Amino acid sequence: MEALVYTFLLIGTLGIIFFAIFFREPPRMVK
């Protein structure tokens, strides 16, 4: 069970970092 918790925390941390960078520096998407 601990492995599941650690995996969840790892994904959550990576998600927070990703969104922080994403919103701080908006991507330049060209349609």
UniProtKB/Swiss-Prot annotation:
Intracellular or extracellular location(s): Plastid, Chloroplast thylakoid membrane
Keyword entries, A-Z: Chloroplast, Membrane, Photosynthesis, Photosystem II, Plastid, Thylakoid, Transmembrane, Transmembrane helix
GO BP: any one term: photosynthesis
GO cellular component terms, semicolon-separated: chloroplast thylakoid membrane; photosystem II reaction center
Pfam families linked to this entry: PsbT
Family annotation (InterPro entries): PSII_PsbT, PSII_PsbT_sf
Membrane-spanning intervals of the chain: 3-23
SUPFAM superfamilies: Photosystem II reaction center protein T, PsbT
UniProt key word Manganese: no
Bilayer topology term: Single-pass membrane protein
Domain of life of the source: Eukaryota
Family: Belongs to the PsbT family.
Protein's job: Found at the monomer-monomer interface of the photosystem II (PS II) dimer, plays a role in assembly and dimerization of PSII. PSII is a light-driven water plastoquinone oxidoreductase, using light energy to abstract electrons from H(2)O, generating a proton gradient subsequently used for ATP formation.
Assembly and interaction partners: PSII is composed of 1 copy each of membrane proteins PsbA, PsbB, PsbC, PsbD, PsbE, PsbF, PsbH, PsbI, PsbJ, PsbK, PsbL, PsbM, PsbT, PsbY, PsbZ, Psb30/Ycf12, at least 3 peripheral proteins of the oxygen-evolving complex and a large number of cofactors. It forms dimeric complexes.
Name the record gives this protein: Photosystem II reaction center protein T
Name of encoding gene: psbT
